[in-house]
Amino acid sequence: MANSNLTNARNAKNDEFYTQYQDIEKEILAYAEYNPEVFRDKTILMPCDDPEWSNFTKYFAQNFERLGLKKLISTSYAPDSKNYKNKYQPTLFETNDPQFDENKSVKNGKIFILERDKTGDGKIDVNDLEWHYLEGDGDYRSKEITSLRDEADFIITNPPFSLFRDFLAWIVAADKQFVIIGNMNAITYKEVFPLIKNDKMWLGNGFHAGNAYFSTPFAKEYADGVYNSETGLVKFRNVCWFTNIDHGRRHRPLTLMTMDANLRFSKHKEIKGKTEYDRYDNYDAIEVPFTDSIPSDYDGVMGVPISFLDKYCPEQFEILGTSDNGIIDDKYKLTPGLTNKFVEDYYKSGGTGSYKEGNPTAGYYQDQVAKMAYKRIFIKHKSVTI
């Protein structure tokens, strides 16, 4: 369900999803609590943001002085570039402003800037935002927005799901600090995983209980259980914050049981009662299907779900690679990929996935039945605890 929901998100007319204020506040406070000076005298750029509607703009404007910001810049796409089905209706905020231009309102993006006490009330807040039309349509790849990127210290936003790879590359190219929202499956993208493996990007503090709620003009296109008609929000579970800003949760080591204790007492039926952990047919590693089943005393390589990264502590584990693209040192590979025999056994056992010989997916035999492990990350303890 989660994957199909995000597919709908990618296919939505403009990937227009608005993050909840409390989720933004919870995330940003995690960085500020870990390092109270992290945002002091810094410039934050929020591209792809629709400042008139965005809770990102609202949060940072309201907390401008508390965070000690130097400057806040927020930009939006031109309505024409979003391919609205219905005629675009500008806000009263825009139409009541002397600089309102009916043509530019649909053809040009907008930029909002906060850096001074415009109202003269002795504080800098949301009432001091100043705006004007951009020269172009607000696409982050334009020279106009790229120059703003180069000026900024931080890039913070919820980019269109469909453009996540390209947007991240745009940030990384300028070596900026960032906090952005994306699909958790992006972890194993070949353009993304090396950043995680090399400790240049990690997961943020996270959404409450792992549930991300968004408002969107297309909410009713989602099924019951995803769209809540009472709140008008859609819920995605497979969404997370990606960042390169440090936070305290990242340095909390997992409390784990030994391998023997897991095999005897695990709450998971896939582990409890077994004589040993399953081993992959094509990787020199054991299959660990749950993060809380990682054995504390195993000094070899382990394959874990991508959700492990939400609990990853860099002082506790080393990330070695991923099965999704076979991005791992050859010394950990038993074969170049899935063997022809394993693939045949998989289909003989009733497997329905699409696999062929040489595929990097991690495969293993469970009670002599060939199984495929979905998107595994290979890890190893930095030091073993008995």
PLM-predicted stretches and their roles:
Residues 1-156, 160-386:
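Class I S-adenosyl-L-methionine-dependent methyltransferase catalytic core
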